Amino acid sequence: VVLCFLGTGLVDMKVTQMSRYLIKRMGENVLLECGQDMSHETMYWYRQDPGLGLQLIYISYDVDSNSEGDIPKGYRVSRKKREHFSLILDSAKTNQTSVYFCAQGAPEQYFGPGTRLTVL
């Protein structure tokens, strides 16, 4: 009898967000950048306000293929490479102060550490 065991350890999937904390003045442009290392086609941007769950802002199915989520007003996105997905606020408002999360993958999602944006 020959037994063969194949290693199936956890895969380390990384989602990076370039800034953990940002402070901007009202009316300034804001660029939130997200990167991933698994070349997933599907990526997401969410925001989470105190006491609320995640709210989907945008979803991207691949390069230059994006759909609005539940709260797209005041935001736009850019995805020129599969590994990068940026969220853009052209004129930041105080009500956009929140924690923003980028995620990759479908159906299982892997999240970045989040970026806390404060608009003064």
UniProtKB/Swiss-Prot annotation:
Signal peptide: 1-11
Keyword terms of this UniProt record: Adaptive immunity, Disulfide bond, Immunity, Immunoglobulin domain, Receptor, Signal, T cell receptor
Region entry J segment, spans: 107-120
Sequence segments annotated as region (V segment): 12-106
CDD domains, sorted: IgV_TCR_beta (cd05899)
Biological processes annotated in GO: adaptive immune response; cell surface receptor signaling pathway
Single GO cellular component term: plasma membrane
Disulfide bonds: 34-102
Domain of life the protein comes from: Eukaryota
PANTHER family for the chain: T CELL RECEPTOR BETA VARIABLE 28, T-CELL RECEPTOR BETA CHAIN
Name listed for the protein in its UniProt record: T-cell receptor beta chain V region PHDS203
